[in-house]
């Protein structure tokens, strides 16, 4: 593991000193390091300290993940065995269970900005699992979406969208006597 430390500074001025190998899990940081664009610290203007600390916790746990990037010059790490993968999956589930939905939305934005693919997938899957069995009204409430259709307009749109299901299939009808 690299002993080089990188200082990451959040949008609210909070600084985090992390191992370079952990910082490289943030693809935006990895590219800055590869392009020799780093002097003393890396400012991350779109991420608050609270969210960055959660992202870094995830990255520290996933520092040994296999990266399927053929252009990577780093030696490939061996694929984790089934038990290690199950342990990591269990850790991910526990990690997400303790985070409220508002923070998950902020993590999605941060993971996208920082290009942390594993965290982006995990957070998006968590939201997808959460809304899976919800009604449209419950989903609107969760995402603060205002329904601008009246009940009648909504029914008509559904009828139009599914009109094919109500059309008579003339090819298979019995001919009239």
Swiss-Prot record:
- GO annotations of cellular component type: nucleus; SCF ubiquitin ligase complex
One short Pfam name that applies is Skp1
State which tissues express it.
Answer: Expressed at low levels in seedlings and leaves.
Ranges for region Interaction with the F-box domain of F-box proteins? 108-167
Task: Report the subcellular localization.
Answer: Nucleus
- By its UniProt entry, which Gene3D superfamilies does this protein fall under? Potassium Channel Kv1.1, Chain A
BP terms from Gene Ontology: auxin-activated signaling pathway; jasmonic acid mediated signaling pathway; protein ubiquitination; response to auxin; response to jasmonic acid; ubiquitin-dependent protein catabolic process
What is the protein's major site of localization? nucleus
Which range is the signal sequence, renumbered to this chain? none
Q: How does it assemble?
A: Part of a SCF (SKP1-cullin-F-box) protein ligase complex.
Its family remark reads: Belongs to the SKP1 family.
Report what the protein is called.
SKP1-like protein 15
Encoding gene per record: ASK15
């Amino acid at each position: 593991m690299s002993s080089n430390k990188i200082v990451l500074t959040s949008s609210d001025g909070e600084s985090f000193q992390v191992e370079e190998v952990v910082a490289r899990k943030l693809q935006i940081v990895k590219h800055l390091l590869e392009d020799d664009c780093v002097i003393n610290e890396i400012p991350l203007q779109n991420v608050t300290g609270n969210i960055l600390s959660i992202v870094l916790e995830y990255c520290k746990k996933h520092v040994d993940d296999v990266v399927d990037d053929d252009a990577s010059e780093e030696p490939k790490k061996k694929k984790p065995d089934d038990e290690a993968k199950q342990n990591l999956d269990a850790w991910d589930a526990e990690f997400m269970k303790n985070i409220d939905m508002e923070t998950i939305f902020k993590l999605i934005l941060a993971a996208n900005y920082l290009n942390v693919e594993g965290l982006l997938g995990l957070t998006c899957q968590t939201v997808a699992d959460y809304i899976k069995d919800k009604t449209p009204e419950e989903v609107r409430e969760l995402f603060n979406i205002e329904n601008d259709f009246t009940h009648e307009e909504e029914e008509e749109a559904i009828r139009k969208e599914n009109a094919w299901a109500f059309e008579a299939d003339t090819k298979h009808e019995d001919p009239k006597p």
